[in-house]
Amino acid sequence: MYPSLDDDFVSDLFCFDQSNGAELDDYTQFGVNLQTDQEDTFPDFVSYGVNLQQEPDEVFSIGASQLDLSSYNGVLSLEPEQVGQQDCEVVQEEEVEINSGSSGGAVKEEQEHLDDDCSRKRARTGSCSRGGGTKACRERLRREKLNERFMDLSSVLEPGRTPKTDKPAILDDAIRILNQLRDEALKLEETNQKLLEEIKSLKAEKNELREEKLVLKADKEKTEQQLKSMTAPSSGFIPHIPAAFNHNKMAVYPSYGYMPMWHYMPQSVRDTSRDQELRPPAA
């Protein structure tokens, strides 16, 4: 009579090592047929849709290399070049051991770091200089560019002095200079408005003076025409012969021509202080 087979015993039967045929003889005494040359070794698992047959030409790809299971000896070694490049130039060595005697296999990964302080200290690498890399590299490049912009701002604010490295001091200087420039711009704008108003008033005065000049010029031409018409003699004009006058008469106003005039009375005659004696009033 055969012994009873529990679930653990059956699972151990299914997880046998095919490379060692000696284990098959241990279970033949119980009447269990475990021949591997049959077409369907596990009919119970096939009914559940599980395929446990190994394809001879099946090739798996791990990273940049390909693994041929037909010639696989159980140990997989990865070269350091196949491991992704790390920020701190970490050389990784991974060793994967697959045990075919177990159901899922065991995977073992070993990593060796050349620099233990790499995770704590951020060193300058070549990947950061090319603009790529991790978030730490991008953040470092951003800070470097920001520091350069602050240095340029400090040199622009104070050209003759050494650029400052204190960012709050640079920002304070920039705010102060901007406020000063804003006040100067407002003052210049007010001055410009005043000058524009003065220019408008001067233009109005200029137009008024131009009109007055035209009026005066017209009056001058009119006066000249009148003078020319008064002084110009007519074609049939005969000069008047002055009348005879006494030689002791002289002209008072030369412009009036020589007209007979009496001499001035002497001072003794014009004295009226003794008129009562010399010339008594008529009775």
From Swiss-Prot:
Main location: nucleus
GO cellular component labels: nucleus
Keywords recorded for this protein, A-Z: DNA-binding, Nucleus, Transcription, Transcription regulation
Domain of life, source organism: Eukaryota
Name assigned to this protein: Transcription factor bHLH104
Compositional bias ranges of the Basic and acidic residues kind: 107-120
Encoding gene (name): BHLH104
Organism: Arabidopsis thaliana
Domain spans labelled bHLH: 130-181
